[in-house]
């Protein structure tokens, strides 16, 4: 899949899809996934780094 910008609820939905039953860390106030995936495009591999 191509890299894409994912913000807010779109980012959460993508994490649910990628992580499934493993769940994930989502702390919007913490630097990390938002910078990586919202401010700049990220890949599904990047998202997997945030799964539990």
UniProtKB/Swiss-Prot annotation:
GO process annotations (BP): glucose metabolic process
Location relative to the cell: Secreted
Transcription is among the record's keywords: no
Disulfide bridges in this chain: 7-38, 19-51, 37-42
Family: Belongs to the insulin family.
Biological function: Insulin decreases blood glucose concentration. It increases cell permeability to monosaccharides, amino acids and fatty acids. It accelerates glycolysis, the pentose phosphate cycle, and glycogen synthesis in liver.
Subunit structure: Heterodimer of a B chain and an A chain linked by two disulfide bonds.
Protein name: Insulin
Gene symbol of the encoding locus: ins
């Amino acid at each position: 899949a191509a890299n894409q910008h994912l913000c807010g609820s779109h980012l959460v939905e993508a994490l649910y899809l990628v992580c499934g039953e493993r769940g994930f860390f989502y702390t919007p106030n913490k630097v990390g996934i938002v910078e990586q995936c919202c401010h700049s495009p990220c890949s599904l591999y990047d998202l997997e780094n945030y799964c539990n």
